[in-house]
């Protein structure tokens, strides 16, 4: 369907609500295409003229988490957690971690790590903790990290979870995980 007039997005959707520590997200466009721009960097960097929350991590998180939910809904259509919005907190002023505590939490870059809200494998891993907490056996089950890694590995079709967590160039003859953590 073609849109007439203006359209506005706030990245508050049916399944994911983005909350960015850099500011609120609201972008309006005329016509059928919403171009959110390209940010010039990481953390709180935004495209020229954009709202303060139009960060790389908010845009990436909204996309990646919604894709993970779409896949899961096709396998678990009766799971109520997959049908209700979850808050995702982006650019939290800390580093080298991410988490799930009923909400998703992703940290800014620093301390030798990249922004965890800009890495598809980290989104999928943290989503895996949420799914583990809301599956047929509620609560985080042992081995929780293994379950979360499995979800990320299956979605991205890779054995290296969280690639680019550390800002280093990895080698390893096709297996970039041999020197990365």
Segments predicted by a language model, with ranges:
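Acidic/polar low-complexity interaction segments
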Residues: 1-74, 78-84, 88, 92-96, ...
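Short, glycine/acidic-rich hinge or "gate" loops at secondary-structure transitions
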Residues: 77-90, 139-142, 161-168
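Loop/turn elements at helix/coil->beta-strand transitions in domains of secreted/extracellular proteins
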Residues: 84, 119, 128, 157-160
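Active-site recognition of the HExxH zinc-binding catalytic motif
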Residues: 121-134, 145-149, 153
């Amino acid at each position: 369907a073609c849109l007439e007039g203006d359209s506005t997005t706030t990245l508050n959707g049916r399944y994911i609500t983005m909350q960015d520590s850099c500011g609120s997200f609201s972008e309006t466009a005329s016509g059928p295409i919403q171009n959110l721009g390209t940010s010039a960097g990481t953390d709180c960097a935004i495209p020229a003229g954009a709202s303060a929350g139009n960060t790389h991590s908010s845009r990436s998180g909204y996309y990646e988490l919604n894709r993970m939910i779409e896949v899961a809904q096709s396998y678990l259509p009766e799971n109520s957690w997959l049908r209700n919005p979850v808050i995702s907190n982006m650019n939290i002023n800390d580093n080298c971690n991410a988490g799930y505590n009923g909400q998703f939490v992703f940290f800014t870059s620093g301390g030798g790590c990249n922004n965890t809200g800009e890495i598809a494998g980290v989104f999928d891993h943290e989503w895996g903790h949420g799914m583990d907490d809301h599956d047929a056996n509620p609560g985080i089950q042992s081995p929780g990290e293994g379950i979360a890694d499995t979800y990320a590995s299956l979605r991205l079709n890779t054995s290296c979870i969280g690639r680019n967590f550390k800002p280093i160039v990895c080698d390893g003859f096709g297996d970039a995980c041999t020197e990365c953590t």
